């Protein structure tokens, strides 16, 4: 998979504050679902804002498809049609009177024709399953609907990379499942998705890769391997995912081969634990 967006040697400090990121190398690879994890204050939000152009590194550089980003109007426009960030609180992002007006804001600022803007808005509303809310005032939306509207505004820009800050936070289980299904659909249509989360179980289940932000830097690898690194999890202030713990127990009991992948969801765990009984045939009656 090719590198879409990358930070090279990037450092950043807020005014009159400590250095948040120092000499960081970080990349988003095309087609990979990436979970970004770390304790509060580890720099996740800063990293996401650097990747999306909301902040500029004090040193180092941001690259898109191998080319350094220029922070002039043309360069930032190119970046924002490649990378879109959706913040955690939708109320920090929504401002227009209605859902369709809010979703149309980004495309309108690209100077597109009215017909193209309408097409993008309709496409984004359909992707987030909120077409029926197009004319609804944003202040009358539920929290989950506001989340979906904020994501639709980013999707309407047709980015190649969609970065989401804690997108499942505050959603009930049904809302979480619906959102994850939507993200899977976006990935299937070619969008690379990055999700910041504190939920290690969600990261194990959903992500192809996981990046753990620790005081020693960003450590990225296949999710199942990265989230089994107890040393890195400890540095990142995270617990061991239940799926990793379950896999270790199954291997200790001889129920899972050492080279076989562990369960990433309850359904996979049920399948693994049912396999020995199935293999041995039906029980005597």
List the model feature ranges, each with a label:
Residues 211, 215-225:
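Conserved switch/coupling elements of ABC/ABC-like ATPase nucleotide-binding domains
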Residues 61-78:
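ABC ATPase NBD Q-loop/coupling interface
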Residues 154-155:
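ABC ATPase C-loop
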Residues 162-165:
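Catalytic Walker B motif of ABC-type/P-loop ATPase nucleotide-binding domains
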Residues 37-39:
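The feature captures the beta-strand-to-loop junction immediately N-terminal to the Walker
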Residues 115-133:
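Conserved ABC ATPase "signature" region
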Residues 52:
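Helix-to-loop junction immediately C-terminal to a conserved catalytic motif
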Residues 137-141:
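Conserved ABC ATPase signature
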């Amino acid at each position: 998979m090719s590198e879409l967006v990358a930070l090279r040697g990037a450092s950043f400090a807020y005014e009159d504050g400590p250095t948040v990121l120092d000499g960081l190398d970080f990349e988003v690879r095309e087609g990979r679902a990436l979970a970004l994890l770390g304790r509060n204050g580890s720099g996740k939000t800063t990293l996401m804002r650097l990747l999306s152009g909301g902040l500029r590194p004090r040193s180092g550089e941001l690259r898109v498809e191998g080319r350094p980003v220029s922070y002039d109007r043309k360069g930032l426009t190119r970046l924002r049609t490649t990378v879109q960030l959706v913040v955690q609180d939708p109320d920090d992002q929504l401002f227009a009177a209605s859902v369709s007006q809010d979703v149309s804001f980004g495309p309108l600022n690209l100077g597109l024709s009215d017909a193209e803007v309408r097409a993008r808005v309709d496409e984004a509303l359909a992707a987030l399953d909120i077409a029926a809310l197009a004319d609804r005032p944003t202040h009358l939306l539920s929290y989950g609907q506001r989340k979906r509207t904020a994501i639709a505004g980013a999707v309407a820009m047709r980015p190649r990379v969609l970065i989401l800050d804690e997108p499942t936070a505050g959603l009930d289980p049904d809302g979480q499942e619906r959102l994850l299904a939507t993200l899977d659909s976006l990935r299937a249509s070619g969008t690379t998705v990055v999700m910041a989360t504190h939920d290690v179980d969600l990261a194990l289940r959903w992500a192809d890769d996981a990046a753990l932000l620790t005081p020693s830097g960003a450590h990225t690898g296949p999710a199942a391997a990265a989230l089994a690194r107890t040393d890195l999890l400890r540095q990142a202030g995270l617990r061991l995912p239940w799926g990793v713990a379950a896999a270790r127990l199954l291997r200790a009991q001889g129920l899972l081969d050492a080279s076989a992948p562990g369960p990433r969801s309850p359904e996979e765990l049920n399948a693994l634990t049912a396999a020995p009984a199935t293999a041995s045939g039906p029980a005597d009656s």
